[in-house]
Amino acid sequence: MRKNIIIITGGAGFVGSNLITLLLKLTKNKIISLDNYSSGTTKNHIKSKRVKYLKGNTKDVSKIFKNTKNINSIFHFGEFSRIYQSFKNMNDCIDSNSIGTNAVFNFCLRNDIKLIYSATSATLGNNGNDKNLSPYAF
């Protein structure tokens, strides 16, 4: 059986929705967006019979996707994406960026699913010469 499903975490965000548009042009795969809509929006939804949008958290990826046999790959863009908010909502930031990302990584490893991960520019800094300046960069 052909693995014909691509999952995009953060598919309702700017980067995720643009990736969905590109994948619709370049592939014949079905696409599933998993987004908690903390910064993504339904206005970014791409209308296509090949795209399905799910509201959920990356930390629950194993519960959400129980049938993995047709999943080809996961593009992981679903993270807490606002540096200034990471100070106000540190627990949400850690929950999404650390726990959620770990869940996605382990899900892919356990199920032999390709992972494409895009780290945040906030992880780039002063070449390690100073401490991380926000919880977002951890």
Model regions and ranges:
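N-terminal Rossmann-like NAD(P)+-binding domain of SDR-like oxidoreductases, especially those catalyzing
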Residues: 1-138
